[in-house]
Amino acid sequence: MEVIASLAHYYDQPLRCFTFGDFLLVPIIKEFEEILGCPLGGRKPYLFSGFYPFLDRIAKIVKISAQELGNQIENGVVGVPRKCLEEKARALASQDEWAPFIDVLALLIFGVVLFPNVDGLVDLAAIDAFLAFYNSRESPIVTILADLYDTFDHRCEKSSARIACYTPTLYVWLVSHLFRQEGRHVCPLKGHRSCIEKREASWD
């Protein structure tokens, strides 16, 4: 988190990039496709329709009653508590119900890693993005990148603003540009892991 907070100081809002003297770094779609392992390809990009989904749609997937989900409100935000989903995932794993387990795990990734909003809660915005991917295979990459720029813009306007979203992705993206080695891996995450070995990695 400290690394990302430091990175924010180098963000140039008018240019929409990070500036290091005469050197510019710009997050692009292709890089985020590789990091997240989710190529856009011919997929339709996810765009919020303006209407949040009914909870009964997600209830069928995570195997939790819609009534129970409807009672989950935190700080005025409707969603599914992370703790509730984690408990459900453990229960499904203990029963060897791997298909719904994977669905619950994917929802947790969308709510906790990709689209975090309220701590400890997977809100309706994250659920909507998950359902678009689950039902129509819509790619969240474009939305993630747009939210990333919006977050740093907000940080420029209000220095106390917290950077909560995409910090793992941003960290891998940054490290993939700081380190280089021969035969660079297609996935920057793999390159990041191998850069621990000093003899194989070098600074640009």
PLM feature spans:
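Structural stabilizers in ordered domains
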Residues: 1-204
